[in-house]
Amino acid sequence: MEMYPRHRYSKHSVFKGFSDKVRKNDLDMNVVKELLSNGASLTIKDSSNKDPITVYFRRTIMNLEMIDERKYIVHSYLKNYKNFDYPFFRKLVLTNKHCLNNYYNISDSKYGTPLHILASNKKLITPNYMKLLVYNGNDINARGEDTQMRTPLHKYLCKFVYHNIEYGIRYYNEKIIDAFIELGADLTIPNDDGMIPVVYCIHSNAEYGYNNITNIKIIRKLLNLSRRASHNLFRDRVMHDYISNTYIDLECLDIIRSLDGFDINGYFEGRTPLHCAIQHNFTQIAKYLLDRGADIVVPNTLIIHQYIQ
């Protein structure tokens, strides 16, 4: 048997819920099924802001062999689990396939489908969990007004994971990105702000002022895979987004310049890429653009010559 800091059957074991030896003292599931069969609501909460099902899901140990079909039961588990139990989760998905494309909202909180919720949980999400949901009917590209038209991939890209808390370094898990692509994630779908995933990624990476270096490999991959996107959503704006969000990797700029029909002097929101570089005092980027045909005589209130030494 593998060695772990704590015995796998101990009171505080991280493996709790996976073994029959652990499960022998579980709660009586008949009580839970009786709650459900008598209409226990997933939205009516007690003074602690918990509904009956949430209270159950936050128990330390779980052993649900069968549960009545409910519209948001998978969503609720992903939101409220305490110790994640994969065998339990798998049974829950397989017996509630019909609800995997339902959108789960409570008050002002917009959660989306189970895959949206999973994509928001960077500590939990794995390719296998994603495949379980998608193979059983959860639309990989599900989106709706309830999720600000964001796909699960958008949801995954909207927050980072702290990899090194001491230095605040954040990163995307490339294996998760690859799993999205393998499962058919459409990289050309915009959210309600008109951002396809790569543009959303570019903005999200810069949102908190973090340097983009740790994620640049992912951005390069997404740039290359987004070539089929509508020109107005990608080709005609992405260099402006890239430079305006303080990115300096020249290989990404090369990828953008290689897009069919790309105009290095093209305008987006009234500015050319050169304007964006000058605004942020990126002399290296400005010289890169000038060396590749950027027009120094362009309409703008800035006197570009003052910034190019």
UniProtKB/Swiss-Prot annotation:
ANK repeats lie at residues 13-44, 110-142, 160-189, 197-231, 269-298. Keywords: ANK repeat, Repeat. InterPro entries: Ankyrin_rpt (IPR002110), Ankyrin_rpt-contain_sf (IPR036770), Multifunctional_regulatory (IPR050745). PROSITE patterns: ANK_REP_REGION, ANK_REPEAT. Belongs to the orthopoxviruses VACWR203 protein family. PANTHER family: ANKYRIN REPEAT AND SOCS BOX PROTEIN 2, MYOTROPHIN. Corresponds to the C-terminal part of Kelch repeat and BTB domain-containing protein 2 in cowpoxvirus. This is Ankyrin repeat protein VACWR203. It comes from Vaccinia virus (strain Western Reserve) (VACV). The lineage of its organism: Viruses, Varidnaviria, Bamfordvirae, Nucleocytoviricota, Pokkesviricetes.
